[in-house]
C-alpha cells in the first residue's frame, strides 16, 4: 500500500526545488488519502504549496487549483538542503490571507483545464544568465537606418587630443565650449590615470604644446590655405575631408566664394582655439600675474614689435641677404616662445579679422544655394549674441571656464577685445579727513574771541550757500574767505545789473559772459545765494574808521574786518527769496540792537554820539519801519525829517546821491 507524507509547506516555489515544469499532472481529491487531504485543507494551509513524498521514492509538489483538483509537479532531483530549516514553522506561522474566493460555478465556467498550457513556465527563464552572454541594450529608434556614427575610442591621449582639436576646428557648427569643458578635462583625466598624479601635468602640457602654432606658422597655414591641402596625419585629414564633403566642396575648385568664406571661418576658429590652449598653459605655469601690468613688463618687446611693423621704403637700397633653410630652423629653435606675448599677438589677429569682416560689404547675389550654412556662420561672427563672435566667445567660453583659473588674463583679454574707450576717465574724489579733526590752535583762538565776535562768526558759518561751487572752502570753520572775482573792478561800479553777484558766486575758472550787459533783468537771480561779503564792499567810497576791529587768526590768510554801521546806503539784493535763506529762531538778531540785512554779520550796539545823530538826519526812513512802542515825539520828528527833502530844490539833491535804506536804526 502506498503511503503519503507531507514533508513541508511553502508559500512560493523557489528555484532550488528543481521541479519538472514540462510534465505537470492533475489529480482529483479522491485520489489523495483522506488523512493527507484533511491536513492540506486546513485554514492555514489553503494558500500554500505542499512538498510531499510517496513511498519514500517519489517526491512532488502539490498545489490546489479549484475545489476538488490538485496539480502535481514532479521533481527532477530532490535535495534535502533546499527545504526550510524548520518544517513545522512554515506550516504553523504562515497565516492565510483573506481573499475572496470564486464560487464553484465561476471555476466551472472558466474551464481552467484548457488554460493550463498557458500557465506553464519556461525552465530557461528560471536559470541564471551566463557571465559570457551579456545583454546588449539597443536604444535606437525603430525607423532609424543603420548609419549611426560610433564614437571612436582612443586609448592613447595623443591621438585623442589630435582628433578633438581638428574636430573642433572643422566642425564649425559645434560650440567651442565643448572643447574646454569636455575634451580638455577628459585629456587631463586620461593623463592623470596613465602617468600618475605627480607627473601628469608635464605630459598634459607637452601634448598641448604640440598643437600651439607660432605667428609665422599660423600665417603660412591660412594665407596659403594649407587647411584645404591633405594632412600628413590620417586623423586630421579625415576631419578635413568630412568638412569639405559636408559643404559639397571639391578639391579641384579652390577659387569659389564658398571656399573663401570657409577659410575665414576656419581662421577665426583656430585663433580662438589657440587662445584656449595658451590660457590652459598659462594657468598650469602660474603666469597669470604677468597680465596685471603687462604694458610695463613687456614695454621693450612692444616697442620692438611696433618698430618691426613700420612700413619700409618702396626702393630697397641694399639687397636682402638670403638665408638658408638651416639658418631659419636655428632661429626658430633659439627664439623661445613667450606664452603671454603670444596671447597678445593672437588677440591682435582676432581684432583685425573682426574689423575686416565688419567693414566688408555683403553681396547677396554671390551667395550660392550650398553656401547658406557658411554664410550664416560668417554672419554669426559679427553677431554679439552668438558664441562665434568675440563678445560671445568671452561670455560663453572665457568667463565661465577661465575666470577663476586665470582672472587677470581674462580681464586683459576683455580690455583688449573691447578696444580703447573714448570717454575721459573721471578723477577720483579725494576724501580729506582733516575736516573732522580740529587743531588745538583753532580751539584756542575760538575761546579767545568775545561773545559778540563768536556770534558774528556763527552767522557767517550758517550763511554758507548751497551751491556746490561755493562749498569748496578751506577746512577751517571760523574764517570767511571770499572768492576773488574774475572782474574785481566791477564791484565798485555803479550799475543796476546783478551780474556782479553772479560772477562773485562762481569759481575762478568761470569766464566772464561776454553776451551779458548792463540790464535790469532778474534771470541771474536763481544763481544768487546769501551774501558772502560785507555790505560796505559795494559802496562807491571807502571811509576809514577808527573803530574798525581787526582779527588775525592762524587759519585765515586775510584779515577779518568788522566795520561799524555807517551812513552808506544799503543795496537791494533782489526780488526773490531763496529757500536756503531761512534763519532759525534762535539765530535771529534783535532789530533794536542791530541793523543789518539778512545774512549780514551782526555788530555790537554802540552808544550814539552827536556826530552819529547828525549823520542819521540825512537818512530817508522807510514807511514800513514803524514801531508800536515809539513815542509821539519820535513820530513827529520822523515826519519832519521826511518832509524836508521834498522841499529842497533838485539842484541840491543832484550833488549828493542818496539811496534808500531797507532798515534804519532808531535814533535814541
Swiss-Prot record:
One matching Pfam family: Sld3_STD
Gene Ontology biological-process annotations: DNA replication; DNA replication initiation; double-strand break repair via break-induced replication; mitotic DNA replication checkpoint signaling; regulation of mitotic DNA replication initiation
Locations listed in the record: Nucleus
A molecular-function term among this protein's GO annotations: chromatin binding
Chain intervals with Basic and acidic residues compositional bias: 626-636
Chain positions covered by the region annotation Disordered: 429-450, 621-668
Record-linked InterPro entries: DNA_replication_reg_Sld3_C, Sld3, Sld3_N
Note: Present with 125 molecules/cell in log phase SD medium.
Annotated protein name in UniProt: DNA replication regulator SLD3
Recorded name of the encoding gene: SLD3
Amino acid at each position: 500500500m502506498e503511503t503519503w507524507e507531507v514533508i513541508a509547506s511553502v508559500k512560493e516555489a523557489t528555484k532550488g526545488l528543481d521541479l519538472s515544469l514540462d510534465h505537470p499532472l492533475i489529480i482529483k481529491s479522491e485520489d489523495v488519502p483522506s488523512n493527507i487531504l484533511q491536513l492540506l485543507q486546513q485554514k492555514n494551509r489553503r494558500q500554500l504549496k505542499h512538498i510531499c513524498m510517496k513511498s519514500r521514492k517519489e517526491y512532488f509538489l502539490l498545489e490546489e487549483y479549484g475545489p476538488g483538483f490538485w496539480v502535481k509537479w514532479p521533481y527532477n532531483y530532490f535535495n534535502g538542503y533546499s527545504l526550510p530549516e524548520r518544517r513545522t514553522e512554515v506550516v504553523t506561522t504562515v497565516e492565510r490571507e483573506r481573499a475572496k474566493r470564486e464560487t464553484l460555478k465561476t471555476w466551472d465556467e472558466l474551464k481552467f483545464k484548457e488554460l493550463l498550457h498557458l500557465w506553464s513556465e519556461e525552465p530557461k527563464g528560471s536559470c541564471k544568465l551566463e557571465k559570457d552572454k551579456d545583454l546588449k541594450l539597443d536604444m535606437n529608434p525603430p525607423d532609424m537606418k543603420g548609419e549611426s556614427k560610433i564614437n571612436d575610442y582612443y586609448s592613447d591621449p595623443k591621438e585623442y587630443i589630435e582628433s578633438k582639436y581638428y574636430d573642433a576646428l572643422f566642425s564649425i557648427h559645434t560650440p567651442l565650449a565643448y572643447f574646454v569643458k569636455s575634451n580638455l578635462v577628459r585629456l587631463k583625466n586620461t593623463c592623470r590615470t596613465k602617468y600618475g598624479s605627480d607627473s601628469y601635468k608635464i605630459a598634459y602640457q607637452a601634448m598641448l604644446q604640440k598643437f600651439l602654432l607660432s605667428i609665422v606658422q599660423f600665417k603660412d597655414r591660412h594665407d596659403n590655405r594649407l587647411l584645404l591641402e591633405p594632412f600628413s596625419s590620417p586623423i586630421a585629414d579625415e576631419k578635413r575631408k568630412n568638412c569639405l564633403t559636408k559643404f559639397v566642396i571639391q578639391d579641384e575648385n579652390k577659387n569659389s566664394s564658398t571656399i573663401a568664406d570657409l577659410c575665414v571661418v576656419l581662421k577665426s576658429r583656430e585663433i580662438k582655439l589657440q587662445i584656449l590652449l595658451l590660457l590652459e598653459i598659462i594657468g598650469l605655469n602660474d603666469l597669470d600675474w604677468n597680465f596685471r601690468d603687462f604694458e610695463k613688463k613687456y614695454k621693450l618687446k612692444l616697442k620692438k614689435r611696433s618698430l618691426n611693423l613700420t612700413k619700409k621704403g618702396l626702393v630697397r637700397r641694399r639687397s636682402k641677404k638670403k638665408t638658408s633653410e638651416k639658418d631659419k630652423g636655428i632661429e626658430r629653435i633659439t627664439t623661445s616662445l613667450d606664452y603671454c606675448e603670444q596671447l597678445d599677438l593672437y588677440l591682435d589677429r582676432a581684432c583685425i579679422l573682426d574689423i575686416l569682416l565688419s567693414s566688408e560689404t555683403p553681396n547677396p547675389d554671390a551667395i550660392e544655394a550650398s553656401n547658406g550654412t557658411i554664410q550664416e556662420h560668417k554672419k554669426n561672427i559679427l553677431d554679439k549674441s552668438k558664441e562665434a563672435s568675440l563678445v560671445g566667445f568671452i561670455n560663453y567660453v572665457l568667463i565661465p571656464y577661465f575666470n577663476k583659473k586665470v582672472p587677470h588674463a581674462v580681464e586683459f583679454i576683455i580690455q583688449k577685445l573691447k578696444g580703447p574707450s573714448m570717454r575721459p576717465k573721471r578723477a577720483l574724489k579725494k576724501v580729506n579727513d582733516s575736516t573732522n579733526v580740529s587743531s588745538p590752535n583753532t580751539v584756542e583762538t575760538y575761546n579767545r574771541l568775545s561773545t559778540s565776535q563768536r556770534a558774528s562768526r556763527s552767522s557767517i558759518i550758517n550763511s554758507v550757500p548751497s551751491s556746490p561751487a561755493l562749498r569748496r572752502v578751506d577746512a577751517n570753520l571760523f574764517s570767511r574767505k571770499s572768492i576773488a572775482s574774475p572782474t574785481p573792478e566791477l564791484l565798485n561800479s555803479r550799475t543796476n545789473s546783478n551780474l556782479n553777484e553772479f560772477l562773485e558766486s562762481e569759481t575762478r575758472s568761470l569766464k566772464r559772459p561776454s553776451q551779458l550787459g548792463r540790464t535790469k533783468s532778474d534771470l541771474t537771480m536763481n544763481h544768487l545765494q546769501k551774501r558772502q561779503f560785507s555790505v560796505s564792499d559795494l559802496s562807491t567810497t571807502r571811509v576809514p574808521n577808527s573803530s574798525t576791529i581787526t582779527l588775525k587768526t592762524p587759519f585765515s590768510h586775510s584779515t577779518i574786518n568788522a566795520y561799524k554801521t555807517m551812513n552808506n546806503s544799503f543795496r537791494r539784493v533782489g526780488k526773490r527769496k531763496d529757500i536756503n535763506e531761512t534763519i532759525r529762531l534762535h539765530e535771529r538778531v534783535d532789530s533794536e540792537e542791530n541793523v543789518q540785512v539778512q545774512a549780514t554779520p551782526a555788530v555790537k550796539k554802540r552808544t550814539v554820539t552827536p556826530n552819529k545823530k547828525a549823520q542819521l538826519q540825512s537818512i530817508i526812513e522807510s514807511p514800513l519801519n514803524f514801531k508800536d512802542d515809539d513815542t509821539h515825539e519820535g513820530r513827529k520828528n520822523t515826519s519832519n525829517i521826511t518832509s524836508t527833502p521834498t522841499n529842497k530844490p533838485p539842484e541840491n539833491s543832484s550833488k549828493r546821491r542818496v539811496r534808500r535804506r531797507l532798515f534804519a536804526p532808531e535814533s535814541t
